């Protein structure tokens, strides 16, 4: 049975990503998937993009990837260049084309024999709405369900969207570094804040084993 490794938000932390893949013991035939936010905030966004491309890994689009793509598209406007100039000057045209090609979600097939279908999104999904019908902003930025039902990108600790998710898919997601590792029957959150000096995390499927490596240092504030 093919093993799948889903990696949380890397944010340019290529050294930690390489260490995590070594800890997972990734070999030919394993499927590696990134849960978005490959770039921005960390030390080596281009290194992450190049590693993902060289490995033939899969990835979904994250909100920071999306923001940086928008800045890149407006790169000839002086005001657009200032905040992300270092990133614009580092990634080449083929790197940007790769980021632009990333989907909002991926369906990975069944989680083992007789298991639920696995899907990867960056942020979240509103319960009861098929993935194909989810709003783009929710897939990229959802964190909470106000009162258990109204979608919000705000961090409301009492109402994580994942706690209300009942499937049918097992969704693996990133984005929510403050809550950290989240483990529910049909939703697993793997953003554990590596770029903020904490850990980089991966979920192995179908075993649901968790792998973690510590950040080398704190690269950015929350």
Language-model-detected regions and their locations in the chain:
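N-terminal active-site segment of His-dependent metallophosphoesterases
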Residues: 1-50, 55
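Active-site-proximal beta-strand elements of phosphoester/diester hydrolases
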Residues: 3-11, 118-124, 188-190
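Residue-level marker for buried hydrophobic side chains located in beta-strands
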Residues: 6, 34, 59-60, 119, ...
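Divalent metal-coordination and catalytic microenvironments
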Residues: 9, 37, 52, 62-63, ...
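Active-site environment of divalent metal-dependent phosphoester hydrolases
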Residues: 11-15, 40-42, 66-69, 127-128, ...
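Glycine-rich phosphate-binding loop signature in dinucleotide/nucleotide-binding domains
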Residues: 24-29, 108-114, 165-166
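Active-site neighborhood of divalent metal-dependent phosphoester bond hydrolases
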Residues: 45-127, 131-160
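Acidic, His/Gly-rich catalytic cores of divalent-metal-dependent hydrolytic chemistry
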Residues: 136-222
